[in-house]
């Protein structure tokens, strides 16, 4: 029912929050610009800039990433490319990816980074301190 859906969204949101705070888990030198930058194709999970100043669009998946995630990321990257000057990278961050999806990603110039579904981030980094 709805409960399972809520839990799923909750942990995807937790993963997003954790990676927004510690983007170096995806790649050293990554700076998160805006967690939810809308570009007319739905919400981008993480929008960042790499150490060389290139824009990076990050698509997060809690489970094994498949074709759907790769196509979604490709659409986001295309949409961002139309709006910003300079190169735009697309990174799919997930615990695992199917072999066909990885081949499609690589053929499309997208990158896959293995990230645990719930990265090990100190608890206090995830929650504002309660006084």
Predicted regions and their residues:
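Charged, terminal alpha-helix-loop-beta segments
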Residues: 1-131
């Amino acid at each position: 029912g709805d409960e399972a859906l809520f839990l799923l969204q909750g942990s995807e949101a937790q993963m997003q929050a954790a990676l927004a705070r510690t983007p170096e888990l995806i790649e050293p030198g990554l700076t998160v610009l805006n967690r939810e930058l809308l570009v007319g194709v739905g919400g981008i999970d993480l929008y960042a800039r790499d150490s060389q100043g290139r824009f990076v669009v990050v698509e997060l998946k809690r489970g094994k990433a498949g074709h759907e995630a790769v196509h979604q990321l490709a659409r986001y990257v295309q949409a961002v490319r139309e709006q910003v000057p300079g190169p735009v990278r697309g990174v799919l961050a997930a615990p695992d990816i199917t072999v066909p999806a990885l081949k499609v990603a690589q053929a499309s110039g997208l990158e896959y980074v293995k990230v645990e579904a719930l990265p090990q981030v100190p608890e206090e980094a995830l929650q504002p301190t309660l006084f």
